[in-house]
UniProtKB/Swiss-Prot annotation:
Entry keyword annotation includes Transport: yes
Name recorded for this polypeptide: Na(+)-translocating NADH-quinone reductase subunit A
Catalytic activity, EC: 7.2.1.1
Family the UniProt entry places it in: Belongs to the NqrA family.
Molecular function GO labels: oxidoreductase activity, acting on NAD(P)H, quinone or similar compound as acceptor
GN (gene name): nqrA
Catalysed conversion reaction: a ubiquinone + n Na(+)(in) + NADH + H(+) = a ubiquinol + n Na(+)(out) + NAD(+)
Amino acid sequence: MATTQSVTRIKKGLDLPITGCPEQHMEAGPAIRQVALLGDDYIGMKPTMLVSAGDRVVLGQPVFEDKKTPGVIYTAPASGTVVDVVRGAKRKFEAVVIDVDNDSTETTTIDGIAGSDPISIAREKLVDGLVQIGLWSAFRTRPFGKVPTIESRPHSIFVTAIDTNPLAADPAVVLADRKDQFVIGLQALTRLTDGAVHLCQAEKASIPGGDVAGVQSASFAGPHPAGLPGTHIHHLDPVSLNKTVWYIGYQDVIAIGSFLQTGQLDTRRVISLAGPKVNQPRLIETRLGACIDELIDGEVDTSVKLRVISGSVLNGHIATAPHQFLGRYDNQVSVIEEGDHREFLGWQKPGFDKFSVSRIFASAMTPDRKFDFTSSTGGSERAMVPLGTYEKVMPMDILATQLLRALIVRDTDSAQQLGVLELEEEDLALCTFVCPGKYEYGSLIRENLTTIEREG
């Protein structure tokens, strides 16, 4: 029988008081004319290309295979024509761009999958089907955040059905019309691990699947990062070099359930289109890899220079060419003003319109106020100063200041002892936000994790 765990209450963290929160109701998005697979979405992946510019592809057709994890296939998110295989410096793979044929009904169907019983399906058959249709890449490992190898088995699997990122969609709203497919997907996940499937959700959230055998429902409450998989894993099943868990987003669980019903790839994705510069912040239904330029056309304030972000304002990627597409694991598009201008004598002003974690501005007198955040860092990089700000936003049992210092000096031995293997870029996004030294800890932790993995 399924089990229910008590609520884990997070006290440390920060809910960013940003304007432009989305209305929690869904609308159909525009018909997308171009989609892409982005190389940076898949850590450590080295592609063997199976298509080239000018080739015709159908939905679910393999477009490249990973040299580093043999057999793992990445498939086309739409039917159409490959218009470009973008490469950057030193021929680094950037993107495969596809012009969508919205009139096409062609799709790849995996034989023997449609109508399969998710409870009794053979693990080998399920794994083979997920790999062939391209859904294997929905899983990521902790530690390191990579797509798992086909032969691996996780100690447990975490389903993230809670989202505390700024401007995020409510998973309960997205799941309301697709509960059956979500439950089927959960049942299938229990076939992939001998351990538990942890269904992580907000306190009192109406998330289906808690009664599925092999699923443990876990509730989390508190400020961001209460909704991040790193927080859940830390509290429920901590990892190490010799212990790996997988995590997956709730919309990918829906896609797995749909795959078991039809044998086909479901690329529907509900995202939050929100932020201070969005005219009508709301949830829209689009597709995997959608061109963000098309999503925001006519939706944003163009009177100022904008920064458009695929993902959270805390940890998303800037949506400029050749990365102007929805990231594989992103459930939101955020739009803020580009903070590339200096404020004359800004340090002398009381700061009624400025937010501060340290409450040094006059805005501290209006704690419920929300702010039109920009991309400005409020200064240039400087020395790291331990003022206790990192500890305020780190809910894990980790010495934040000491760990961050180890990351800066690339002391990977100390970083491992201090818990770096439990973290990824998104787990340190708040540390970057509150850092008085203006350090970017996301890139630093990735550099350290790469070194640790390489050196064993």
